[in-house]
């Protein structure tokens, strides 16, 4: 019985210069995903997945660590320039943008894409504590 050798080609990562960083900063968590201009996600990270649990997950430092993890994943693609899309009112909003800048990405523009209702659904009732 003769065994055939199967050759697997190494997948070469494309070199992409420009990308889009989507930052979803909620009150409980911060989700960062970096994609190319077409919207294909290259890498993502969350503050919960970075080892933070409970109330520490919603801190600016947790968002900073998540951005650093996401940047390590995406650096292999050769991205230099980023457009930043920020969604949500969370505490990791500003620190994640600053971290992207200090890592070495050139930020082209920052856009706030937080959804704002034009008197849509009724908001939940106020908490009584």
Swiss-Prot record:
Residues passing through the membrane, by range: none
Subunit structure: Part of the 30S ribosomal subunit. Interacts with proteins S7 and S18. Binds to IF-3.
GO biological process, one term: translation
Organism field: Buchnera aphidicola subsp. Baizongia pistaciae (strain Bp)
Keyword set, alphabetical order: Ribonucleoprotein, Ribosomal protein, RNA-binding, rRNA-binding
Taxon lineage: Bacteria, Pseudomonadati, Pseudomonadota, Gammaproteobacteria, Enterobacterales
NCBIfam families registered for this protein in UniProt: PRK05309.1, uS11_bact
Signal peptide (from-to): none
Name of the gene encoding the protein in the UniProt record: rpsK
InterPro entries, per the entry: Ribosomal_uS11 (IPR001971), Ribosomal_uS11_bac-type (IPR019981), Ribosomal_uS11_CS (IPR018102), Ribosomal_uS11_sf (IPR036967)
Protein origin, superkingdom: Bacteria
The protein's name: Small ribosomal subunit protein uS11
GO cellular component, as recorded: ribonucleoprotein complex; ribosome
Molecular function terms from GO: rRNA binding; structural constituent of ribosome
Keyword Ribosomal protein part of the UniProt annotation: yes
Function of the molecule: Located on the platform of the 30S subunit, it bridges several disparate RNA helices of the 16S rRNA. Forms part of the Shine-Dalgarno cleft in the 70S ribosome.
Annotated family: Belongs to the universal ribosomal protein uS11 family.
């Amino acid at each position: 019985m003769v065994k055939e050798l199967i050759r697997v080609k190494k997948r070469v990562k494309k070199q992409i210069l420009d990308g889009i960083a989507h930052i979803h900063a909620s009150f409980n968590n911060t989700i960062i995903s970096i994609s190319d201009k077409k919207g294909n996600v290259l890498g993502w990270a969350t503050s919960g997945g970075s080892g933070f649990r409970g109330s520490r997950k919603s801190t600016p430092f947790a968002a900073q660590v998540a951005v650093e993890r996401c940047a390590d994943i995406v650096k292999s693609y050769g991205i230099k320039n980023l457009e930043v899309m920020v969604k949500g009112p969370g505490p990791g909003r500003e620190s994640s943008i600053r971290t992207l800048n200090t890592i070495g990405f050139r930020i082209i523009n920052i856009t706030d894409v937080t959804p704002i209702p034009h008197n849509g659904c009724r908001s939940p009732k106020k908490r009584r504590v």
